[in-house]
Structure formats: structure tokens, C-alpha cells
């Protein structure tokens, strides 16, 4: 799969020459996970695996299987490229192999949106065996909420190859659309409807379904509201969203998230004899939640829900779903991660993952797994990029759009000192990857050039109002706490002698605090700022993403 931001970045690298006045060179970026639990509980028995199977922000997972290949996608909100594509052969060892929305033409609406509240929500990945085509359908939520959202889909015959241009679906309102391909060849889209009329009661929500013609690529007829929930006169329920439909043994099963996105989050299931319903709610719902457990328990996984289920070639069922790993004080920088658990079946024929006080544990065993989990997405691992390739790795993202006008790669990463800051709503000269551990060490080495006033270094992002920037800037090493608009604060600053050569920059996360260090050419690491509170970029400061970290250069005033 070709990544546009990366491919064009390299093309520019072949036609531009390095200008030390206007570019910063990054020699490498490394990331090392250091979570205590993984160190103290190694995988030793065949079948062992860690949850989350994709650590760090990997929310709203959707999965499908074709043959013995499993494919999974997650949300990206205001980041580009959109919709990471993961591949696995065993359900627990996942590799980030590409990005579905990798060209600017596939996702032209991100500029100016909130990084963690706007953009791409809840992509759903499906395979239609009747035309041997993969479909990814999603919503781009515009500023102002669901009423301004754009629902669209893209297709591909090969998920590792190119995906089509987006096809807009103006007839599909609301958010969280998902395809269902019935065994008779018919296709449908199920989605959460907007809350406009008729609103029947407080907090009214509805799920709708509409037929889809795979020949024309368009919807057929009008949407049918087939499941209504909310705070009504008979039951106190919160919004249903993220719906998926499955046909199992001749019955239609509807799964939907319920309860919002915080600790009361859950997944519920329904069953019907017809795809249009009526759907009967399972009497023992929720089929998945952790809201009944004590919040101060050891190593809690909270907010479990937004599930998708898949059947193995051997006939077993598994669920992927989102969850959170907060510290006991309820905060973290990881966001909502992707977990895997087996699906069980009740005596009355409904699927479920947990009941009552069942826990989502961090270490589990998958009997069919030969050996133990092998993954660069779970447990402690080291990730390093020397930027030696003319294409960047698929883990890298930018803010609000394509970063290629500002970067080139090959013998290091060169970022132009663009006069765009990382909070502006326009794409700055930065690339970022997800934080995947409470405790980690990330470092880079930068040759800043000689541009007066330019700043280059390590950037940590929660959203456009909450960031931290460890920068080399005009004879100083500076740690900024970046806030709303120009509300920026210098946390620490040290003057450095004029040096020739690369300067090392490092952040060590200790979970609730960060240590920031720098290293002059040929020297040792020096502490710049110790025990800096991490709450400035905590997940709980709002929005739906976790935090990211990477490298950044700017000539904008800080």
C-alpha cells in the first residue's frame, strides 16, 4: 500500500537540495516501551498474549477475515493519513501495514477541524464475497457535530493496494455507518441516525438501515429507523452507536455500543428473523462492559465497548473492542486501545464477552495460538526509524493533512521551518506516532541548521490546545507547554554554546510525569526538566484520541 504523504515526501527529496538555513535534519527517532506489568509478567506459555493487542490510541476497531488473513482498522479523527490498516494471521500479533485513506484526495476535509473531536470516526471494514471486494465505510465529522458529518466509503480488491476515491453517501445521515452483506447477495448500510426530528424523548437515539446496490454503488430507497433507544418512559438507556449486523445460523444479530465513551461504556446485542427487524434486545445485556467493577481495582481496564466480532476458520468467535488503561487516579495519555476476547454463547443463543463481574485482563491465553504473541503493537517493544528509506513508515501521521510540502526523507528526515504552528488548524512540518505505553523513552537527534528563531525538536500532542515541545531554538534548549492560541509557557530553558553536530533530545515518561533531557555532540545526557506533570496532555482533558509524539520544526512565533 502506497502512503501519499510519504511517497510525495520522498519525491520532493529527489528534487530539492538540503538548505541548512530552512531545514532541520533528524537523524533518527526511537521509542522504547517500559511498562512494569509487561516486565513482571512475561509471555512464557504457548498461547499467551497481552491485551491490548494494539496498545495506545487505536479506538473503534473493526475487523474482517478473508481466508486466514485478518484485517483491522481504527479511527484517526484529525490526523492524516486516515484509517490505519493492521494485518494478522493469529488475531493477537498485529502489524501496521498501511493506511486506507493515504491520498489527500481521499480525505480533503480535515483542515481546521478539531484534532481529537473532528475528522474520521469509527471506520468499518467489510468484505463482500459476492464481488470479492473490500469496503471501508466511515464518517468525517465536521466542526459543529454530527449534523455536518460526511459519510462515505472506499473500496479495494486488495487491502494492501490502492483504495478508491471516496464515494459520498448523502442519504446516510448521522455517524458510524457499517456495511452488511447478506448471503443472498443483497447489501445494507446500518448507522446511527442524527438526532433531528422526530425526537421522541430526552436523549433520543435511533439506529437506521438502508439498502445498498453493489452494482451502482448507491443506496436504494429511504433509511428505515429500526431501533430506537434513549432516556425514555420505560427504560433508562444511553445512546446506541457503532452498529454492526451479522447473520449467524439464519438469524440476524445487531451489536451496538451503548453508554457514551467513558467508564459506563458497553456493548449490547439484539436478534431478529429479518434484517429489518424487529430486533429483540437480549435480556442479559450488556454483552460487554466493565462498568460494574470497582474503579480503584488493580490494573483496571475501563470503558470497554464498541465491539466487532469475527469467526475463525475453525468456527470460533472473537471480539475486538476498545478499552482504556488509566492509572488509579483515572488519567492516562494512551486513549482508547484495541482489545481481544473470546465470544461465548448464552443458552438462549446470544453472543457475549463478559457478564456481571467478568474482567478484561491484560494477560490472556489463546489456545489455538502456536507459541506466544509476536507483535510490535503489544507488550514492551522498541521501535526505531533511521529515515534511511525514501518512504516513511506507515505509523507516521501528520496533523490535518499531507505533510509532504514540508518534508523529505532518505539520509535522515528533513523538515522545513514552515511558518505554521502545530495548533493552527493547518498542516505543520511535523510527523507523529501514537504513544503506546504509560512508561516509555523517546529520543531523536536533530541538526537544527542556522535559521534565526526557528525551533526544532520533539513534539507531544493531545490536541490543538494541549501540546509539549522540547526544542532546540537559537542557541537554547527550551521546553514549551503549548496552550490555547498563544497561551504558551516556557517550562525550562538552558543556553547552549554554539555547537557543530547533532543535538540529542529525549523524553522519559514515568506515567504521571515526564523527564526531559538533551545531549550535546559527544557529550552525556543532561536533565533539562524533571517530573513535569503529564496531565497537560492526558486523555481525560477531552476529545476522543490518545496522545502522540514525534518531531517538528517551525519558524512560527511560540
Model-derived segments and their meaning:
Residues 1-22:
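Bacterial Sec-dependent N-terminal signal peptides
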Residues 21-558:
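Carbohydrate-active catalytic/glycan-binding domains of CAZyme proteins
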Amino acid at each position: 500500500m502506497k502512503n501519499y504523504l510519504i511517497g510525495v515526501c520522498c519525491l520532493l527529496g529527489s528534487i530539492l537540495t538540503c538548505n541548512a538555513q530552512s531545514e532541520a535534519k533528524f537523524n533518527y527517532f526511537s521509542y522504547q516501551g517500559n511498562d512494569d506489568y509487561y516486565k513482571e509478567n512475561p509471555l512464557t506459555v504457548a498461547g499467551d498474549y497481552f491485551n491490548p493487542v494494539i496498545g495506545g490510541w487505536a479506538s473503534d476497531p473493526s475487523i474482517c477475515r478473508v481466508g486466514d488473513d485478518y484485517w483491522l482498522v481504527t479511527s484517526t479523527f484529525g490526523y492524516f493519513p486516515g484509517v490505519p490498516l493492521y494485518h494478522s494471521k493469529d488475531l493477537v500479533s498485529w502489524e501496521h501495514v498501511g493506511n486506507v485513506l493515504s491520498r489527500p484526495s481521499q480525505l480533503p476535509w480535515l483542515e481546521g477541524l478539531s484534532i481529537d473531536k473532528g475528522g474520521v470516526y469509527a471506520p468499518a471494514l467489510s468484505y463482500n464475497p459476492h464481488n470479492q471486494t473490500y469496503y471501508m465505510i466511515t464518517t468525517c465529522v465536521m466542526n459543529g457535530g454530527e449534523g455536518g458529518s460526511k459519510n462515505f466509503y472506499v473500496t479495494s480488491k486488495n487491502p494492501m493496494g490502492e483504495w478508491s476515491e471516496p464515494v459520498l453517501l448523502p442519504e446516510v445521515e448521522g455517524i458510524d455507518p457499517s456495511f452488511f452483506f447478506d448471503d443472498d447477495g443483497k447489501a445494507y448500510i446500518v448507522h446511527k441516525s442524527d438526532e433531528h426530528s422526530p425526537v421522541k424523548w430526552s436523549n433520543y437515539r435511533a439506529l437506521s438501515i438502508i439498502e445498498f446496490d453493489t452494482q451502482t454503488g448507491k443506496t436504494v430507497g429511504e433509511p428505515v429507523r429500526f431501533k430506537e433507544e434513549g432516556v425514555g418512559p420505560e427504560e433508562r438507556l444511553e445512546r446506541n452507536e457503532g452498529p454492526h449486523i451479522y447473520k449467524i445460523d439464519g438469524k440476524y444479530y445487531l451489536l451496538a455500543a451503548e453508554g457514551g465513551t467513558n467508564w459506563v461504556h458497553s456493548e449490547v446485542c439484539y436478534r431478529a428473523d429479518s434484517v429489518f427487524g424487529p430486533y429483540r434486545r437480549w435480556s442479559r445485556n450488556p454483552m460487554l462492559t466493565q462498568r460494574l467493577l470497582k474503579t480503584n481495582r488493580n490494573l483496571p481496564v475501563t470503558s470497554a465497548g464498541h465491539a466487532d466480532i469475527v469467526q475463525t476458520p475453525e468456527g470460533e468467535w472473537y471480539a475486538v473492542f476498545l478499552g482504556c488503561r488509566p492509572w488509579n487516579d483515572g488519567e492516562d495519555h494512551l486513549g482508547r486501545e484495541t482489545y481481544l476476547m473470546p465470544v461465548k454463547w448464552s443458552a438462549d443463543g446470544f453472543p457475549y464477552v463478559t457478564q456481571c463481574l467478568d474482567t478484561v485482563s491484560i494477560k490472556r491465553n489463546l489456545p489455538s495460538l502456536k507459541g506466544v504473541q509476536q507483535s510490535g503493537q503489544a507488550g514492551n517493544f522498541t521501535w526505531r526509524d533511521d529515515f534511511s528509506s525514501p518512504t516513511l513508515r506507515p505509523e507516521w501521521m501528520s496533523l490535518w493533512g499531507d505533510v509532504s510540502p514540508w518534508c523529505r526523507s532518505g539520509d535522515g528526515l528533513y523538515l522545513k521551518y514552515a511558518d505554521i504552528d502545530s495548533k493552527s488548524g493547518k498542516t505543520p512540518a511535523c510527523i507523529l506516532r501514537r504513544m503506546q505505553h504509560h512508561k516509555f523513552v523517546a529520543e531523536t537527534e536533530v541538526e537544527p541548521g542556522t535559521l534565526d528563531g526557528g525551533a526544532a525538536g520533539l513534539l507531544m500532542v493531545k490536541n490543538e490546545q494541549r501540546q509539549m515541545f522540547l526544542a532546540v531554538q537559537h542557541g537554547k534548549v527550551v521546553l514549551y507547554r503549548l496552550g490555547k492560541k498563544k497561551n504558551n509557557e516556557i517550562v525550562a530553558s538552558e543556553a547552549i554554546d554554539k555547537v557543530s553536530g547533532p543535538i540529542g533530545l529525549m523524553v522519559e515518561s514515568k506515567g504521571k510525569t515526564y523527564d526531559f533531557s538533551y545531549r550535546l555532540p559527544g557529550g552525556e545526557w543532561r536533565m533539562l526538566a524533571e517530573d513535569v506533570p503529564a496531565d497537560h496532555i492526558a486523555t481525560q482533558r477531552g476529545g476522543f484520541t490518545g496522545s502522540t509524539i514525534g518531531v517538528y520544526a517551525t519558524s512560527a512565533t511560540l
